UniProtKB/Swiss-Prot annotation:
It comes from Caenorhabditis elegans. It is an enzyme of class 6 (ligase). The keyword Isomerase does not apply. SUPFAM superfamilies: Glu-tRNAGln amidotransferase C subunit (SSF141000). Subunit of the heterotrimeric GatCAB amidotransferase (AdT) complex, composed of A, B and C subunits. The lineage of its organism: Eukaryota, Metazoa, Ecdysozoa, Nematoda, Chromadorea. Its EC number is 6.3.5.-. Pfam families: GatC. This is Glutamyl-tRNA(Gln) amidotransferase subunit C, mitochondrial. GO terms for biological process: glutaminyl-tRNAGln biosynthesis via transamidation; mitochondrial translation; regulation of translational fidelity.
Amino acid sequence: MNLIFTRIIRRFGEGKRKTPFPGDPILVPDEPYDSKIQESQLSPMPQIDAKLINHLERLSLVRFDSEQAVANLRSSIRVAKRLELVDVEGVEPMHTVWEDQECPTFEDVEEDPLPIEEVFRNASLRFDDFFVTPPGNLPLESKERFDLNVINEWDTIGKPVAPEVKLTRMTERKK
């Protein structure tokens, strides 16, 4: 393991920062930026309930398995709400994060379609002329796993971490 790590350091350099093009200035700060936006200017935080958590789990395929995970979601929403205050009047949308870098697009070229049997050759399951995919993120528990009142008050309390996790079958197995 140390040999691999040593080779990686020799190849890429220890502590060297990478940029897309040599000579580009590094625009990412070393320390996090402390926002000057007043919390009173932000729109109110949405109340997170069990229905919303289940909906987000289904959409994102991410399992909120602890109160800390839901508290992190609230923290992310709070950061995203700051973007509502950004004035973007007259600013053209960017296609890439690098202003001076081209984002080439190609013309659509019509090609001969593949035969259906060749398309489905690698499909493990097939129904008529459709691929059968595995089901998405299905909720495992229908009961509420979290104390939602505490979570919805968590960021107003000002604590750096969420309250203690309630014991469930999932957390008991992890211990």
